[in-house]
Amino acid sequence: MDFFFEIHKDLPREGPGDSESTRRAFRKLSALPENPVILDVGCGPGAQTLDLAELSDGEIYAVDTHQPFLDCLQEKVEDQGLDKRIQVLHQSMKDLQFPPASFDLIWSESAIYIMGFEAGLRAWKPLLKPGGYIAVTELTWLKPDPPAEVKEFWNEGYPSMKSLEENLEIIHACDYYLIDYFVLPNSSWTDNYYQPMQARINMLLEQYHSDPDRLQQLDFEQEEIDIFNKYHEWYGYFFYIMQIP
């Protein structure tokens, strides 16, 4: 696990995403209070956290379990003079330490898969105030019957990945009102995630060329990039924007 974080060190994001998609999803929250209380779950180094601070005048709680990501975000928060509005906290998404009905908005980009889509939606729902929103991105099959190579890769990497229709059924079963959904563009995978990761992999391949264990991990990360380049029309990240009564 430590080497995984060495591979991902200093990446702009810890998963596919981009500021325009964050803004597009945020603009769907038509009844959000003027100064919302926001929880950013699995914030990573916090690119979307800072976007949320720009998009709202609210108070943001950004949580993650990897301290170097939190330290990176805390430094950015202080540099931008946002320390009175953004609290950076070491907490697990599986054990969030907040009272019920604490938040107007729960946000999570490229992270809910850690719990599972349905498990995350059910676990976080009590933290929302009445009429509160939740917006998450989730890896989703774009069409049925994917080729064996991509299916086998994601059966190992994320076996519970579902289709759009299945995820919409989960949202309904969890008693959320669906506001909107949209698929992230391919550039959200490449520009801020895979391109900088590829540069990092290339550097680490030279550094650890005689270390079989680390080379194996680098091969897995490289395979993920190669699979996307070959099969990106079969899967993608969807933004799902929901609200409770």
Where are these regions (language model features)?
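A short glycine-rich, Lys/Arg-flanked "PGG" loop and its adjoining helix->strand segment in the class I
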Residues: 119-133
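Conserved alpha-helix/loop element of class I SAM-dependent methyltransferases that forms part
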Residues: 16-34
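Class I SAM-dependent methyltransferase SAM/SAH-binding core
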Residues: 39, 47-95
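A short SAM/SAH-binding and catalytic strip from SAM-dependent methyltransferases
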Residues: 105-118
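Short alpha-helix
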Residues: 160-175
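Short, glycine-/aromatic-enriched active-site segment of Class I SAM-dependent methyltransferases
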Residues: 139-158
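A short acidic, Gly/Pro-enriched loop at the edge of an enzyme's catalytic core
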Residues: 94-105
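Conserved Class I S-adenosyl-L-methionine
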Residues: 182-245
